[in-house]
Amino acid sequence: MKKTILILACGMSFLTGFSQELPKWANKAKKAVFSVITYNKDNQILNTGNGFYIDEQGTAVSDYSLFKGADHAVIVTADGKELPVKYIMGANDIYDVVKFKTEFDKKAAVLQPALQAATPGETVYLLPYSTQKSANGQNGTIAKIDTIGNNSFYYTLNMQTTDKTVSCPIMNGNGEVLGLIQKNS
């Protein structure tokens, strides 16, 4: 009996690392995260993924690989509203990032960039895309920081992620964006 309780307790503590309560600011911030659906010229789904708004004019970011070979794309907001992607503003194949313009849903939120770089060991939060109000995110810590340009950083995290979390934002404790999750190499 004691072994069963110990195994259950260990298992429950392991699971809490994957699904945890987020800070209070996260409820509003999750409204900035959306689903991206890209289509080929025959209007068949090419790829699906995530992205998030970075301003109230409809500027957003996601992973570039979603858009490769796409004819057009739409986003689906946390409220389930489908909006067209108007145009690509810039893309970087090396870092797998794309910046694009879409309509802005007035019910959505905007994620502000972090004013300072994160520090090793700092707790960070992953905000998933969800249409559910009670969707849990997860937290982890910064394991390593690499400088990749003027005030640009590449963070290695102590966090388990999946393909469903690619292009979801990573936030600091102040609710500011540090970056977006990329595919594990």
Residue locations for each model-derived region?
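Active-site region of chymotrypsin-like
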Residues: 29-38, 102-109, 134-185
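Short structured motifs
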Residues: 20-21, 83-85, 140-141
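Bacterial Sec-dependent N-terminal signal peptides
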Residues: 1-21
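N-terminal activation segment of mature serine protease catalytic domains
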Residues: 18-53, 59-63, 72, 97
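Conserved active-site neighborhood of the chymotrypsin/trypsin-like protease fold
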Residues: 55-136, 150-154, 164
